[in-house]
């Protein structure tokens, strides 16, 4: 185990034994059969009886870093104690707290590999500076309006989730092949793997209807659809679901009317259609909304039914689809100044710029000319923070000439 806990109470001893406190700790560890050479964190309590004799109550944590292989072996408090024990002489109180914060972040994420590397790292100055910038940036984002925060949440996969920012390499494995016996549809699904890709208004050349068939009617239903000359696409991984590929000159409503008898008798169930633009043009909001949500959710999560754990994804998808509807097919209700091709939600550089500002916010002003302030007309100090509560500190201890 990484952490070994020991509670030990001595017998009553003469007052002079208080000078031998460390020896008593080592003896307690040795007496209980543990390695007294390991780093240890000791909480001690001294009890004095009526005769003036003292008794020591030790609560000892011993750390064996070589055996730290699993998060379940420790707690965040243990990590804090280990950092206090090993870094107390090399870091200031502020830096110590920042290091504890980043280690706690890795502990809560279950990232034991990175946590081990951080705890082993000899020089953590650069890491502490990075954590400070992260904290500054998060405070900066807390002052965004709700609309700004929502747009960033949509366009950034890991907003405000510890240290996993967008500029770090994304190690997430791509979504596996869904099992459809149609390479074109599989490629379509692979083109939408994140919320930020949903906003690009994917319009595909082919149109599909996805149906779920009752297990007891599967063979008869497939045979009946084939007799009607429907182009059927089966799935090798998910049973009792199929795709119908539509003709280029038809829409899904034409096909659904043909399937009305099967739908009414609950032999088949509609999962989604991909030609949602048809319902947008015809003013059918509910069908446009329902099918958009179902299709995008399937692209992102490989699930046909919404699950409670994905409430945030559902909310973000609803926001995107509803904005498109109420803005006439566009996410933004205005034209972007720099380009009419992109909408504001697609500007990923906004986040990069805020990180650059965060890295440069700690600026030392050497003379009055650098302040660049007109004392007569008044002018804002250019700190680059866009943060109303931030102030410029003047060192009054230095003599002014």
From Swiss-Prot:
Highest taxon of the lineage: Viruses
Places the protein is found: Host nucleus
One of the GO biological process terms: regulation of viral transcription
One GO term describing the cellular component: host cell nucleus
Record key words, sorted: Host nucleus, Transcription, Transcription regulation
Role summary: Component of the viral DNA-dependent RNA polymerase which is composed of four equimolar subunits of LEF-4, LEF-8, LEF-9, and p47. Plays an essential role in late and very late gene expression.
Family, per entry: Belongs to the baculoviridae p47 family.
Quaternary structure annotation from Swiss-Prot or TrEMBL: Interacts with LEF-4, LEF-8, and LEF-9.
Entry protein name: DNA-directed RNA polymerase subunit p47
Species whose genome carries this gene: Autographa californica nuclear polyhedrosis virus (AcMNPV)
């Amino acid at each position: 185990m990484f952490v070994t806990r020991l509670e030990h109470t001595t017998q009553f001893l003469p007052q002079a034994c208080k000078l031998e406190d460390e020896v008593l700790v080592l003896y307690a560890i040795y007496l209980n059969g543990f390695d007294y050479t390991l780093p240890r964190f000791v909480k001690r309590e001294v009890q004095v009886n009526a005769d003036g004799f003292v008794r020591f109550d030790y609560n000892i944590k011993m750390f064996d870093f070589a055996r730290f292989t699993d998060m379940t072996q420790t707690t965040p408090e243990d990590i804090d104690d280990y950092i206090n024990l090993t870094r107390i002489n090399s870091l200031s109180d502020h830096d110590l707290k920042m290091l504890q914060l980043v280690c706690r972040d890795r502990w809560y994420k279950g990232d034991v590999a990175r946590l081990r590397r951080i705890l082993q790292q000899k020089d953590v100055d650069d890491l502490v500076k990075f954590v400070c910038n992260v904290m500054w940036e998060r405070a900066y984002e807390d002052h965004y309006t709700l609309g700004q925060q929502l747009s960033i949440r949509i366009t950034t996969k890991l907003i405000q989730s510890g240290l996993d920012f967008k500029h770090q390499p994304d190690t997430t494995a791509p979504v596996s092949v869904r099992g459809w016996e149609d390479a074109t549809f599989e490629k379509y699904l692979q083109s939408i793997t994140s919320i930020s890709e949903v906003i690009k208004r994917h319009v595909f050349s082919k149109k599909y209807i996805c149906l779920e068939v009752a297990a007891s009617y599967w063979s008869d239903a497939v045979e009946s659809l084939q007799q009607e000359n429907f182009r059927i696409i089966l799935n090798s991984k998910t049973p009792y679901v199929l795709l119908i590929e539509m003709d280029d000159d038809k829409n899904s409503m034409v096909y659904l009317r043909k399937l009305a008898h099967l739908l009414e008798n609950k032999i088949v169930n509609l999962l989604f259609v991909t030609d949602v633009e048809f319902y947008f043009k015809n003013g059918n909001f509910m069908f446009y909304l329902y099918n958009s949500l179902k299709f995008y959710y399937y692209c992102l999560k490989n699930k046909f039914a919404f699950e409670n754990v994905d409430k945030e994804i559902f909310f973000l998808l609803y926001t995107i689809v509803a904005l498109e509807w109420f803005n006439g097919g566009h996410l933004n209700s205005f034209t972007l100044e720099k380009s009419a091709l992109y909408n504001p939600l697609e500007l990923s550089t906004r986040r990069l710029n805020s990180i650059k500002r965060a890295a440069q916010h700690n600026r030392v002003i050497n003379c009055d000319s650098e302040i660049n302030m007109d004392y007569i007309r008044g002018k804002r100090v250019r700190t680059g923070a866009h943060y109303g509560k931030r102030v410029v500190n003047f060192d009054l201890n230095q003599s002014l000439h």
